[in-house]
């Protein structure tokens, strides 16, 4: 079980990323636009730098949805590998069977 403060911080980051996503995308488009002037690119770069640090989606952490474990998360299921194995053995995941060959 992860610390509740770490889970809460990550949830707050999700909100901030969502809030600034449109503005961030607009600034990024200006940066890579070949028709943009140098002044526009410079303004876009400064605008990106002025955004909050937590507005970047790279700062989000994929966590287990059940207990918040930060590592070994299976994206398809949203749970950690440990929890996945445990739930699969108990038959709580429909369609998942232990492989055998």
UniProtKB/Swiss-Prot annotation:
A GO cellular component annotation in the UniProt record: small ribosomal subunit
Q: What InterPro entries has UniProt attached to this entry?
A: Ribosomal_uS14, Ribosomal_uS14_bac/plastid
Kindly indicate whether the keyword Ribonucleoprotein belongs to this entry: yes
Q: Which UniProt keywords apply?
A: Ribonucleoprotein, Ribosomal protein, RNA-binding, rRNA-binding
The molecular function GO annotations come to: rRNA binding; structural constituent of ribosome
Which Pfam families does this chain map to? Ribosomal_S14
The biological process GO terms on file are:
translation
Coiled coil feature spans: none
Q: What does this protein do?
A: Binds 16S rRNA, required for the assembly of 30S particles and may also be responsible for determining the conformation of the 16S rRNA at the A site.
Indicate the family of this protein.
Answer: Belongs to the universal ribosomal protein uS14 family.
Subunit structure, as described in the record: Part of the 30S ribosomal subunit. Contacts proteins S3 and S10.
Q: Which PANTHER family match?
A: 30S RIBOSOMAL PROTEIN S14 (PTHR19836), SMALL RIBOSOMAL SUBUNIT PROTEIN US14A (PTHR19836:SF23)
Which HAMAP family does this one have?
A: Ribosomal_uS14_1
Q: What is this protein called in UniProt?
A: Small ribosomal subunit protein uS14
């Amino acid at each position: 079980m992860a610390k509740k403060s770490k889970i809460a911080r990550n949830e707050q980051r999700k909100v901030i990323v969502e809030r600034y996503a449109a503005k961030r995308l607009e600034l990024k488009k200006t940066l890579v636009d070949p028709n943009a002037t140098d002044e526009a690119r410079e303004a876009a770069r400064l605008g990106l730098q002025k955004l909050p640090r937590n507005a970047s989606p790279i700062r989000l952490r994929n966590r287990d949805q059940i207990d918040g474990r930060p590592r070994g998360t299976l994206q398809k299921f949203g749970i950690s590998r440990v929890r996945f194995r445990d739930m699969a053995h108990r038959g709580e995941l429909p369609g998942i069977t232990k492989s055998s060959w």
